[in-house]
Amino acid sequence: MAGKTLYDKLWNSHVVRTNPGGTALLYIDRHLVHEVTSPQAFEGLRLAGRKPWRKGANLAVPDHNVPTTDRSQGIQDPISRIQVEALDRNCQELGLTEFRMDDPRQGIVHIVGPEQGATLPGMTVVCGDSHTATHGAFGALAFGIGTSEVEHVLATQCLLQKKSKNMLIQVSGKLAPGVYSKDLILAIIARIGTAGGTGYTIEFAGETIRALSMEGRMTLCNMAIEAGARAGLVAVDETTIDYLKGRPFAPSPHSWGQAVNAWQMLQSDPDASFDRVVTIDAAALKPQVSWGTSPEMVASIDGRVPDPRQESDPTKRGGMERALEYMGLAANTPISEIRPDIIFIGSCTNARIEDLREAAKVVAGHKVAGNIKQALVVPGSGLVKRQAETEGLDQIFKEAGFEWREPGCSMCLAMNADRLEPEERCASTSNRNFEGRQGQGGRTHLVSPAMAAAAAVAGHFTDVSTLNH
């Protein structure tokens, strides 16, 4: 019998029924819920006279619309307030677990799930949010779903899905100082393109991946969707198991050994066949900075903004020209000469404790440059915020001139009070640099937390590995 990939194993173990036409009914183990994609789903449930099939499989948290400044004043925007209040009401009425805005465990759903141990190896995990792929770092099959599918999961705990093809991204070599998992995933997307993973589930493997922390692996899987993939996966190892031990939703000490034995089987077989294999030399990577309006428009810190005239494909050339016009950049500008106005360290990609520690190392002993209008640090959850404050990271940021905020999605997307003004340029640790993503006319450059911190103190993009030399 031919070997199975990790994705094959996860898929096969959750198929309830195979249908003609290539689709299958999949059982869903964990459903994460937030305020933006759930109101219509709850209303559909109510109109049909249905109740959630398995209440305990759901975990809800408001994140997209919540304010990151003084919460005693409530939510000022009426639409945002209505969505958060609807989530509170729906969860209370239906008996679903929710970490409300005033709960110390509240935060971004893709940070809260893992830190609570609600994401476990071998699970299927869904959420009405495209960056659900984050949870694949735990050897779980995790993907984003639409509002109608949110209702389906609530009602039946199942979803109709079509199986993806298998892609392996094999990464070897040691990441250089100042180069992080964010740089790695940006370089991967630049290599294969934003459509390179379309129709695939990507497994990230190799010595470089095994050396990453769980935080680093989550960053990698978080942006698999930006390469067009349905999901991203990392096989289970001791790093996974050590991270999960003792978490609130993790197996009890009594059943821990049995769970670990099962989890350790969540690997691709040595003779498993992949539909596509991509190899990456991590040791050759420099810190990455996006220059355009797509996550594939990326250059190394020692590079330049590319010249569209050198692109032979007319469609790509036109896209590059439009991107440069929107971004207010000239071809051949050195990346290190680009000067951001705003610094944003946060989002489900890079707002975990490790991210804040790395940024704080860069900031310590420095001040935010005079040309920076605003520098924000937004922890990914209340628990991350508390841990950072215990370590004194908040004081390092505040002394340098950063604002220290409450947890939430914040400036990743223009759905709350944190947003860019037209033509403001932001060094952002988030995952998308589309036109208007951070605010109408706002210009986004995707970077790692360390690179965002370096840009804050230098006033321009600079190689973080040489900042203090």
Curated annotation (Swiss-Prot):
Catalytic reaction equation(s): (2R,3S)-3-isopropylmalate = (2S)-2-isopropylmalate
Keywords: 4Fe-4S, Amino-acid biosynthesis, Branched-chain amino acid biosynthesis, Iron, Iron-sulfur, Leucine biosynthesis, Lyase, Metal-binding
Residues holding [4Fe-4S] cluster: 348, 409, 412
Cofactor requirements of the protein: [4Fe-4S] cluster
EC numbers: 4.2.1.33
UniProt-listed CDD domains: IPMI (cd01583)
Cofactor note as given: Binds 1 [4Fe-4S] cluster per subunit.
GO process annotations (BP): L-leucine biosynthetic process
InterPro entries, A to Z: 3-IsopropMal_deHydase_lsu, Acnase/IPM_dHydase_lsu_aba_1/3, Acoase/IPM_deHydtase_lsu_aba, Aconitase_4Fe-4S_BS, Aconitase_4Fe-4S_dom, IPM_dehydratase_rel_enz, IPMI_cat
Secretion signal span: none
Pathway membership, UniProt: Amino-acid biosynthesis; L-leucine biosynthesis; L-leucine from 3-methyl-2-oxobutanoate: step 2/4
Disulfide bond annotation, renumbered to this chain: none
Record field: transmembrane: none
GO MF term (any one): metal ion binding
UniProt superkingdom: Bacteria
Matches recorded under Pfam families: Aconitase (PF00330)
Family from the record: Belongs to the aconitase/IPM isomerase family. LeuC type 1 subfamily.
SUBUNIT field: Heterodimer of LeuC and LeuD.
Summary of the function given for this chain in its UniProt record: Catalyzes the isomerization between 2-isopropylmalate and 3-isopropylmalate, via the formation of 2-isopropylmaleate.
Protein's recorded name: 3-isopropylmalate dehydratase large subunit
Taxonomic source organism: Nitrosococcus oceani (strain ATCC 19707 / BCRC 17464 / JCM 30415 / NCIMB 11848 / C-107)
